Amino acid sequence: MKIADMNWAQVEAYVARDDRAVLPIGSTEQHAGLSLCVDHILSERVSVEAAEPLGVPVYPGLPYGMTPYFMAYPGTVSLTTDTYSRLIRDVLDSIATHGFKRILIVNGHGGNTSVKSTIADWTAARPGVTVKFHNWWNAPATWRAVQAVDPVASHASWMENFPWTRIAGVEYPAHQKPML
């Protein structure tokens, strides 16, 4: 279930019986002909599809991340490490304040991985709260499926090319360009 589809009383009732929540994080950056929000779209979709059958609430995904290397591409939004770390801490503070003690962060952007140290520090200061950080593509079954379709599995490759990350009206190649 999505937090967006709940009211405060439903969250209060949920936390009285379970303390799990999911927070997807992504980025807004170029992905060749795909959506600028591929990393956000994928982390949120994976989160919802995994958590919904378990009845675990999923917070709205954070659509921004750390991606300074793509700032030459129009539409990219990049946060500094300091800003992103503060954002993650503030969001975790809010989620934990309301009784969620087991929080899974599902990451969709490799550039966000450096925030793991912020999360470790935050968690160390809050006994009883556990935060796990997971890159959606690192689940063993997922990685095997990715490798079967896209052995290169790089940024904006077939690994991230799904009907829900494509832009209507954009032509896509029928084959994968070889790595240089």
Language model feature labels by segment:
Residues 1-104, 108-180:
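Extended, histidine- and acidic-residue-enriched regions that form the cofactor-binding/catalytic faces
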